[in-house]
């Protein structure tokens, strides 16, 4: 009977995490689309929705604490609960980055250089893909997919270096630091952080499934 209750609570925990992951991915995609279209309504929707993502994280934290206090989870269950807590934290931070991107969508002035714009678009696309892949690895309980996703962040890091070079070139061409170049650099930094958090999620998915974190057996 106790195991049945525990399994039910673990399933509820997984379901809550997937709702949060969906909300976070939607916020990220919407903020990037709002930036591309200079869509103030969509940008404001992302900003207004951040409190909901924060609330979902707190609900997950509460479920985890309740489960640990009232049930008797074995080691594999503890891996799962610990990973869910960590994943929820990374999702909340991605939600914050989506809000930051949406705020820039409201203030960005003028047009960016074509090459710089292309690099930012690719960063946004890659960030969304990595987050989606990490979430799918959790849904499918696929450790191999999680491991494959971990390596994808290197592409975002390389694009971030390209954006920095684009910005330096733009400053040299203009002879001054235009505000839109500063905002472009901030956008790239936010997207780079999204990639880092998505990689963290994939690493915690692998831990939940195998007990291995960054190649080491924990707990």
Positions of predicted regions on the chain:
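Cytosolic, long alpha-helical scaffolding segments
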Residues: 1-219
